[in-house]
Design a protein with these regions (language model features):
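Catalytic-core regions built around general acid/base machinery
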Residues: 91, 114-126
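Structural motif
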Residues: 5, 97-101, 129-130, 170-171
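N-terminal beta1-alpha1 cap of cysteine-dependent amidohydrolase-like domains
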Residues: 1-97, 248
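C-terminal and late-domain segments of enzyme folds
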Residues: 1-40, 144, 148-248
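Catalytic nucleophile loop
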Residues: 101, 122-141
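Charged helix-capping and loop-helix junction motifs
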Residues: 60-63, 112-117, 186-188
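Glycine/threonine-rich flexible loop motifs
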Residues: 105-114, 182
């Protein structure tokens, strides 16, 4: 299996609250990388990051189908798996591409466990693409940082949960967009994420940055990214640079 774990895939803009399809992001060669791994006339399944939000899922499915076509990625089937049709997960062996959508990390994590996706991917040899929450849930141990009001101050909120085990890297997406974010009266980065990084490295990706995982488990990070470890932020790469190879 190959995997492309992105902060964002792009593929849409919002106009008056409506999703308008566009080509996928081309920053740091993201679209070229997807094309190089893409099988012509693929069968594709998106697994929702908001499994009970059906209107949103229908909108994402419709938009991404057109976006992939605009991006020169051909397919014969394009499915959205959410709470309405969990049974289609049995078709994973037929799929050439599985996409893990963005959404709420803990909600998607529960859904992935219901689907037994980790077990289903053990002997699957297709292309896995993920963005945002989907990328975060690919970790062996997922950093599910607080994101909704109340989560940062909830003593029962679990910030570390088991994931799909595709990588040991903990991804923090949309970094540049969240630098000024305030949650429950605290700075999301400095007060919350830095504290959670004690003893745990978190890799922060800007939109347009991504990690490519090859069949031999080597991981290459493309684009601007940062290491957050023990409360310290270290820049580890720049746009248009392939800068880090890890063997996990």
């Amino acid at each position: 299996m190959k995997a492309i774990l992105a902060s964002s895939l792009g593929g849409q803009i919002k106009v008056d609250g409506k999703r308008i399809p566009t080509k996928l992001m081309e920053n740091n060669g993201l679209l070229d990388t997807i094309r190089s791994c893409w099988k012509a006339d693929s069968k594709v399944m998106i697994i929702s990051g908001s499994p009970s939000f059906y209107d949103k899922n229908d909108s994402v499915e419709s938009c991404m189908k057109e976006s992939f076509s605009l991006s020169g990625l051909s397919f014969t089937e394009f499915l959205m798996c959410d709470e309405r049709n969990k049974e289609i997960i049995a078709r994973i062996p037929e799929m050439d591409v599985v996409i893990l959508a963005g959404g709420h990390v803990p909600s998607q994590n529960v859904f992935l466990k219901e689907l037994q996706l980790k077990e289903r991917l053990q002997h699957w040899n297709g292309l896995l693409i993920a963005w945002s929450a989907g990328s975060m849930n690919c970790a062996e141990t997922v950093y599910a940082g607080p994101e909704l009001p109340g989560e940062a101050v909830d003593p029962d909120y679990r910030r570390w949960i088991s994931g799909l085990g595709i990588t040991r890297t903990n991804i923090f997406p949309h970094f540049e967009d969240l630098k000024e974010e305030i949650l429950d009266g605290m700075r999301l980065i400095e007060d919350i994420t830095y504290a959670d990084s004690i003893g745990h490295e978190i890799i922060a990706l800007n939109n347009g940055s991504y990690i490519l995982i090859n069949e031999d488990s080597t991981e290459t990070i493309y684009g601007e990214a940062y290491s957050i470890l023990d409360g310290k932020l270290t820049r580890i790469g720049s746009d248009n640079v392939q800068f880090l190879d890890l063997i996990i």
